[in-house]
Amino acid sequence: IAQFPWLPEPFEMDGISQVKKGANLNENPYPQCVSINNKYIYDIPKGANGYSMSNVVVTLSHELGHFLGLYHAFNQLLNGNTNSNEDSDYCTDTPPYNKYRYDVALTNYLTYYGDITSTTSDGYKEFVMRTNSKTGEQFRSTNIMDYAVSDANAFTTQQAERVKYILHHAVFVPGPKDYTGTDFTTTRNSTSDFRFTPQFIE
């Protein structure tokens, strides 16, 4: 699970909430962090061709992507519904696909054949492929912000641009910042009318 970043006014980005001018950052009651379930922390694939859908290295990279402003690479509405053909990650260079339909097929496969544990298996070769919901074309899943069976070893150019923008401007994200034109405080003795709301995503 990860918290999405916050951008201080006047900085803005599609899909990212703003801290309004005059806000006190000390009034944020929610942790700005990434959390990994320790049930999976030791789940690392074995051998050169080993594979696990809950690989902790990929999971951590994925959750850090959310922390730095990235949405899932598949179609997902704000209410969590994945049975959609809407491209919802604010990056036009990530091919969209209907995750609900994909999951139905994958679940049926796993129920009948069991876990996919090798990148050379027929199951991996079949389910690493996706169908673009806009064009109908097949593509290989390589994006770290995808789920399930995926190479999970790449970000796109637009995803990298989003991350750079967040690194340069977001509050609660470590590093040097450009806060030109912003107006917020971090003093413990002042209050503001702005209220933080949680923005968690898995």
PLM segments and residue spans:
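Extracellular (secreted or membrane-anchored) zinc-dependent metallopeptidases
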Residues: 1-61, 67-202
